[in-house]
């Protein structure tokens, strides 16, 4: 009888611990709320190796407020024309990860999974290949940075660095 009581107590403890951890896991809405500061228009500066430039990006709630739509507009540089890009990002509670995917007017496309810890989103690229990562850091409600990805360019490895400020 004593052994059966111990087994039942162990099972009950495991169930209570499991339900407690499920309750502390952020909900989809909690996760989406953490990114609400992004909604609006941003002016960004970026460097990639020896290159530096500016661009604008805008975030808007879409698809029933379950997704954020991000648009980029990069001006023409050198021989390259302007580039427009559209991305969607949201939190998927089924896999406990953020997802982000989109395409550019120059035929580039990317897909990513991400995790958020406080004000930091760590993204891993999954399309077109599984290499590369980027870290988004919320500095304030009107400023964030992006560091990464790193990749080879003109015989050396470069890392992208972006600093964005929200417009008024």
Q: What is the predicted role of each segment?
A:
Residues 8-15:
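Bacterial N-terminal signal peptides
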Residues 22-168:
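Hydrophobic small-molecule pocket/channel-lining residues, especially in calycin-type beta-barrels
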Residues 1-7:
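Bacterial N-terminal signal peptides that target proteins for export
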Residues 17-19:
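N-terminal signal peptide c-region/cleavage motif recognized by signal peptidases
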């Amino acid at each position: 009888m004593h052994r059966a009581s111990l087994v039942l107590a162990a099972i009950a403890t495991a169930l209570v611990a499991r339900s407690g951890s499920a309750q502390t896991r952020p909900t989809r809405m909690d996760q989406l709320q953490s990114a609400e500061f992004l909604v609006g228009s941003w002016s960004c500066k970026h460097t990639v190796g020896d290159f530096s430039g500016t661009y604008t990006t805008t975030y808007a709630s879409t698809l029933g407020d379950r997704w954020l739509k991000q648009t980029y507009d990069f001006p023409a540089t050198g021989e390259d024309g302007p580039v427009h890009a559209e991305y969607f990002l949201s939190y998927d509670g089924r896999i406990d990860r953020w997802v982000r995917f989109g395409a550019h007017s120059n035929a580039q496309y990317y897909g990513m999974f991400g995790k958020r810890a406080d004000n930091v989103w760590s993204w891993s690229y999954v399309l077109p290949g599984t290499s590369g990562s980027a870290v988004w850091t919320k500095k304030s409600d009107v400023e964030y940075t992006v560091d990464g990805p790193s990749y080879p360019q003109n015989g050396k490895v470069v890392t992208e660095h972006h600093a964005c400020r929200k417009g008024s």
